[in-house]
Each structure stands twice: as structure tokens, then as C-alpha cells.
């Protein structure tokens, strides 16, 4: 909500926050990374604040809901938060997909009542 508190009700939600932890991997290259989040709403459409919000995955341009390009990964566990504050948030099931370095690195599902 407006005070950045977690809520379960869609009518109280003003934005969606996606929290994740990039696991430690001493074999991975270090440096800045871009993370993309796709949030698929109850109607099956990807929530996006712009029609230009696109990134490449498996040779196709696909829409993203939120992105961060300033993630400085140094091979150690790193918490990251991304925010979506576009279209009105309605009740229902939302599917969340997380992408980095050309891979889908995570998925989750949330339900707002």
C-alpha cells in the first residue's frame, strides 16, 4: 500500500513488489546484471507500464512488467527488490516470472483477494 506494507486485498494494493535473492555462485561472472520481471494478471495479460517494455528471451521480444539494470552481482547472495506500479491491481491469481542473463531464473504465484 502507500506505506509500503504488505496487503492481501487487491483494493488496498497500490503496487506489486517482487523480492528475490540471487544465490551465491563463485563460478558466475561478476558485474552489473539486468533482471526482468513479468507479471501475468488474472486475465492472462502481462502487466506493463509501457508498450516499449520489451526484452529478448529465446530469440523473441517479450513484454516485462519491471526491470532493474543496476544489480551489481559479485558472486555472493544478493537480495533484490523490483516494483510494478502500472495498471490497476484487481483480485485474482498473478503469475510472476523472473529473468536474468537470457534465462528464466524463477517463477511464483500470488493470489490477491
Residue ranges and their predicted role:
Residues 1-113:
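Membrane-proximal structural modules of membrane-associated proteins and complexes
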Amino acid at each position: 500500500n502507500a506505506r509500503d506494507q504488505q496487503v492481501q486485498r487487491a483494493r488496498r494494493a497500490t503496487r506489486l513488489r517482487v523480492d528475490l535473492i540471487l544465490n551465491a555462485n563463485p563460478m558466475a561472472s561478476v558485474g552489473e546484471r539486468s533482471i526482468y520481471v513479468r507479471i501475468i494478471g488474472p486475465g492472462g495479460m502481462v502487466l506493463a507500464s509501457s508498450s516499449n517494455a520489451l526484452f529478448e528471451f529465446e530469440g523473441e521480444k517479450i513484454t516485462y512488467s519491471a526491470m532493474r539494470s543496476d544489480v551489481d552481482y559479485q558472486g555472493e547472495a544478493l537480495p533484490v527488490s523490483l516494483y510494478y506500479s502500472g495498471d490497476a491491481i484487481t483480485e485474482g491469481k498473478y503469475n510472476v516470472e523472473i529473468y536474468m542473463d537470457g534465462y528464466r531464473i524463477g517463477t511464483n504465484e500470488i493470489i490477491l483477494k
